[in-house]
A protein has these predicted regions:
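Acidic/polar-rich alpha-helix caps and helix-coil junctions
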Residues: 1-122
Length: 122
C-alpha cells in the first residue's frame, strides 16, 4: 500500500497548479515555500520559490524539492521518467544514451492481450 505524506501532496499540488496555468500561482508558491521553510527550519539557507519564476523554472524547483523531500521513498525514478530527465540526471550507460522506449514501462500481461505491449517489451 502506497502512503502519501502531506509534503508529497503539497508538492503534487504545486506542480499541478504550475502546469495547469502559464506559470506558478501564489498558492502554489506558498505551498512549495512551506515545505522549503519547514525543511530548513526557517534558516533562509535554501532559495525560496517566487512568482517571478517562469513555468519551467518553477517546475524545476518542484522536481528538485521532490528529490530532496522524498529521497529514499522510491519516487525519484518515476519523476525522472515522467519528466523525461533520464539523459540529464544519469550518466549514459552506453554510447547510444537513452531513447523513447526507456521512458516506457511494460503493460501488465492481461492488459497487453487486448491493447498490445509497449515497444521494447514485446
Amino acid at each position: 500500500m502506497k502512503l502519501l505524506r502531506f509534503a508529497d501532496i503539497l508538492l503534487i499540488y504545486a506542480e499541478a497548479a504550475n502546469m495547469a496555468g502559464s506559470g506558478p500561482t501564489q498558492l502554489a508558491v506558498d505551498r512549495l515555500n512551506s515545505i522549503i521553510d519547514r525543511a530548513n527550519e526557517g534558516t533562509g539557507t535554501e532559495p525560496r520559490a517566487t512568482l517571478a519564476m517562469t513555468q519551467a523554472q518553477f517546475d524545476q524547483k518542484v522536481i528538485d524539492e521532490r528529490s530532496f523531500e522524498l529521497c529514499f521513498e522510491n519516487d525519484r525514478y518515476f519523476d525522472v521518467l515522467r519528466k523525461r530527465l533520464l539523459q540529464e540526471v544519469n550518466l549514459p550507460d552506453n554510447a547510444d544514451g537513452y531513447d523513447e522506449n526507456d521512458y516506457l514501462l511494460p503493460i501488465p500481461a492481461l492488459d497487453a492481450l487486448s491493447i498490445g505491449q509497449n515497444p521494447g517489451y514485446e
